[in-house]
């Protein structure tokens, strides 16, 4: 890379069944498990950005994404109609998809048109653009164990391109794999939103984090190894980044992807990146 | 100003054939690649199905078994020599792998769901991350090619494999990679056939884009891959390519409705406009458009409106050549954008416009003229549109090398 890709991290949002915001997770001692602790009841994402008429048709995934995104955008001051949305998820709208599999198992049976159009990977970005009148391009990606790295590459390369908006909201989100595809190693339901921008925001939004981030090629980055036949965990991948944001000071260098362990049938990647995060 | 990115190789398979040669021969001979759907789907329509038994996966890839993976392998193997050259030119880690898909291997999960209902367990060997996951298609192509740069899937329904060109262009311009293997892979499944039937847009007959007798869409499967590269190597200078370059890409969101396009074609117009601007050109520089042209009354009306608004009523019925190809392949959904980019590329290389099968009689109320018969035409700059659920639009601009 000629010069490192960089941006300002202005806001963060987190929503999981156990923690309804980033501060709630920090206050709880930054637990690795994002599900409710002990006998705590699971929360419900408010997804206030969506009109109730739209909201009632949406899945947990879409509501989590909208809720986390509103938190990040509010902190750093992202205008919803002037932002590029990037969603990265391995399973996407998996609850809606599995409900459709149940409908499809009945030969000749009816298929819900709403469930069908809500099963696409870009469902959340579609609803978000409708709710905010946003005509900028958005995208929905899947990158397996490289979700965080790929999301940052897309977001930062997009901010650098002349033709896009000056703000990006990067969202990493999963719904827990439902039956019959349940897996002990699957990620819990959660959404993480990061507001990334060409310029810092504190001048107009005092709560803006204004952490400078840079992506650097690092061939030797010691990414965590994932055993074959184990699902890579996005929740584990994002932990160092969440902790560095919570610390909010000094300098942190974060490896971005999990590597699959010695895979006989999975060719590895050669490029790895480290995310450098520091105070302005 | 962003550079022009030459295309060095391409490959396609779909209802027209299993090899690029067979696909393009059929396209320029005006032969449809559609067949009546098998009874098991419980719907009456025509589909574009990759013909014949698909070759088995190589032993190393057997755990990825799925129709999706077999189609991915079929389209990738003819590209291996070209990919080796690209890897040698830039380094395997400097080549990205960006694929569009909407279905991925969902057909395998359809069978798995029924298996667990009947046997209280998933089928032996079924792993959701290899049979069904979007990302599995990238792993299959990565394993076959040894491309080692960033690899991911864009899944924005029917615009997926048009938007891969935008991602590739951004990564190359940001200096992250020097080349990208881009494309799309989609495979037939109950989900899309019966889902679109539920939306009441499936045509019981071969589809008729832009015809006054259009009755909806046909679903197709298949794949296309293209190698896009930085124009000039710092030490080796220029290198051999196909004489066609990626000039620009435009993307937009309708911000209107999950399934219905904006009635005024706003998003489609913005996508075309942004592609033209990204290339530093004017609408008057464009001489051909491969339309999205699904054959639904709504798509064709709003896309026509967008074209008329951007290029003017005269050019839309005059010297602007409009080509609709879904009558050949059906709507290949997540593979449509890359497939139609290959059609555009072949059209520029051969200086030929393919005939518009099924487009006759043209719906005069649309105010645009779609090409109907095979004819000679030396187009220099061609847009290819893909418009999707969620209001996700993309227009890819390809041009002859100057």
Language model segments and positions:
Chain B
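Conserved active-site "lid/cap" helical segment
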Residues: 21-99, 105-106, 271-283
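ACP-dependent fatty acid/polyketide chain-elongation machinery
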Residues: 1-64, 101, 231-245, 342-357, ...
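Active-site pocket-shaping loop/turn-to-helix segments
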Residues: 59-80, 123-133, 151-163, 208-224, ...
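Condensing-enzyme catalytic core mediating Claisen C-C bond formation in acyl metabolism
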Residues: 4-8, 13, 25-46, 206-279, ...
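Acyl-CoA/ACP chain-elongation machinery
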Residues: 176-198, 203-214, 249-263, 291-301, ...
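Active-site-proximal alpha-helical scaffold in enzymes
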Residues: 80, 134, 142-145, 150-183, ...
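Active-site-proximal gating segment of KS-fold condensing enzymes and close homologs
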Residues: 101-152, 299-314
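Conserved small-residue
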Residues: 9, 27, 79, 97, ...
